[in-house]
Amino acid sequence: PGIVFVAGREESALRILREARRQGVQAIFLGGDGWQGIVSDTAAANGAYVGTSFNAAGRKPAVQRFTKAFQDKYQTKPDAFAALAYDATRLVAEAIAQKGRSRSGVREHLASLTPAEPFQGVTGPIHFNASGDPIGMGFHVAQVVDGSLVSGGGNSRSRPTVIAAASEHR
């Protein structure tokens, strides 16, 4: 196969990648945000592509401030899960500040967000559709290159940027 997409989390993805490598499968492997920690096994994961909703190497000032504060406190770069938790916490805090502590007030604030006036999170601008699903957050595809998640992939003509390194996921 040319491309193999594996839906799943880190543990199952690594089992599949290891077995595929053992059997000599020559394919591009692609996974979602549950794959972020696969960089810890550089032999199995090298060359795989990982979808993520956050790029710690992003250029926006809010992303840089969040990444620096996170690194200063935890001595590692934040991953998408940390960024999503940060955005969710800030979003609820903003809703409470605007509409009070009631569930209906928080819901009202979240429903008031629009594409023209979204919540500006570190994962991107966020608003919600009529069903309450988040819309507008960013999505990045990174490639595992020598134990790091690299934005743009290792074969990009632009200079690749390290998003997270293997040592940060152990």
Question: Over which residues does each language-model region extend?
Answer:
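Extracytosolic ligand-binding ectodomains
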Residues: 1-170
